[in-house]
Amino acid sequence: MNGILAVYRKELEDHFSSTRFILLSTLILMVSLVIAFMVGSGLRDELKDVAKPTFVFLMLFTFPGKLFSLISFIAFFGPLIGIVLGFDSINRERSDRTLSKLVSQPIYRDSIINGKFLAGLVTITIMFLAIVLLISGLGLRLIGVVPGPEDVWRLAIYSLISIFYISFWLGISSLFSVIFRSMATSALAAIACWIIFSFAVPLVASPLADAIYPVDQSTTAPDPELLVQHEQARKAISLLSPMTLYSEATTTILDPLRKTTQSLLLMGPMERLSISRFQNPLPLRESLYIVFPHLISLIAITSLCFAVSYIFFMRQEVRST
């Protein structure tokens, strides 16, 4: 345990003093605040003469401003945080010839990779919680609505899901750092996975579903069973993307009016407020039931990536030269 803590403290100090991490975290924080400001200003203007519902505070995170929502921003660019923290975690030690010195210390070998992953996880947690707290404070000032207990719980669960989502990319980049000796190669491999899973998979989901279950668009009344099979196939393919898992889970958690992980309608704030008068929002427990498979999937793939990294690292030969 002492070995893990020693590596953890050293890596945590390196992360917070790294120039690239400081620049990336500052950029993400600034963009997040700009998005929250635009969304908050728009909500304040539209809700000026309207009775504010209890969940209006959560709209800061779910509704797009002039660009996109905070959920979409974290879904697309949050993985870069994990990649930056992990792509050189092991091969940097190899290139600096310090890995053999670490292994020769009176610590267990697995303390090295465990301490490095723990430091990355804590760094992600601190950074994301700082973003959520700053946006919440900005929202309090802009829309003047104090979040209720359920809003706080939903934000806490949203933060937990986001931390696991970014940690998955930390595990992916750490795995490539163990496999490849070149830091540039591991970084490119991690970025390639990010592009494939975040952009390519959602784009090809519909064409693949069309190929598996072709729907004749020329007919006025297509087969309902075929339409259901087509939609199920498209959803199954899109769920291969961690970004889709994350987006559906967090949107359902932060939007109490959503009773499914996928919505066919796009509504603005005023439409949301109008429809809320005719339906009751889901309680937190019901929302958790809906997103529980997504949360378990994110935890599973994150654990799998770290486990594979752990096995590869423990079986690799470490030479002193």
What name fits each language-model region?
Residues 179, 292, 296-321:
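Junction motif at the cytosolic side of a transmembrane helix
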